[in-house]
C-alpha cells in the first residue's frame, strides 16, 4: 500500500566527495551507505558525476583512457531530520579525519509518496 507521509519533518543529507575517497580501507560512498543501512536510515543513493570540482578547485572529469577515475560523487540520504542529524554527528569526526575535502549539506524535503517494495 502506498502512503503519503508527513507526520514528521524530513530532510535530505548530501555528502559531496570523490569516488576515490576512503574511510580506512573502504571507499567513502560504500562505507556511508552500509553505515546508513545499519543505522536504519530510510534511503541512500550514490550519484557519480561526470565533471566537477570541490574545495581543491581542481576540475575532475571522465576520461576514457584513465583506469581509475577521480570523479565527483554525491551520497544522498533521506529520513527524518532528527535521524539524519544524529547520523551526521556519528560520521562527522571520520569525515574530518579524511585527508581530502568534502562538503556536507542538509535541506528539508517533502515525501510525497513512499511505497515499500516486495
What is the predicted role of each segment?
Residues 1-118:
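Positively charged, small/polar-rich N-terminal and surface patches that mediate targeting and assembly
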Amino acid at each position: 500500500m502506498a502512503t503519503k507521509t508527513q507526520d514528521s519533518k524530513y530532510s535530505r543529507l548530501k555528502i559531496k566527495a570523490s569516488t576515490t575517497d576512503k574511510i580506512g580501507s573502504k571507499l567513502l560512498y560504500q562505507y556511508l551507505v552500509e553505515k546508513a543501512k545499519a543505522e536504519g536510515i530510510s534511503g541512500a543513493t550514490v550519484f557519480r558525476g561526470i565533471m566537477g570540482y570541490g574545495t581543491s578547485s581542481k576540475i575532475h572529469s571522465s576520461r576514457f583512457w584513465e583506469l581509475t577515475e577521480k570523479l565527483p560523487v554525491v551520497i544522498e540520504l533521506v529520513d527524518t531530520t532528527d535521524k539524519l542529524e544524529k547520523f551526521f554527528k556519528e560520521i562527522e569526526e571520520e569525515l574530518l579525519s579524511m585527508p581530502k575535502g568534502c562538503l556536507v549539506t542538509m535541506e528539508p524535503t517533502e515525501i510525497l509518496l513512499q511505497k515499500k517494495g516486495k
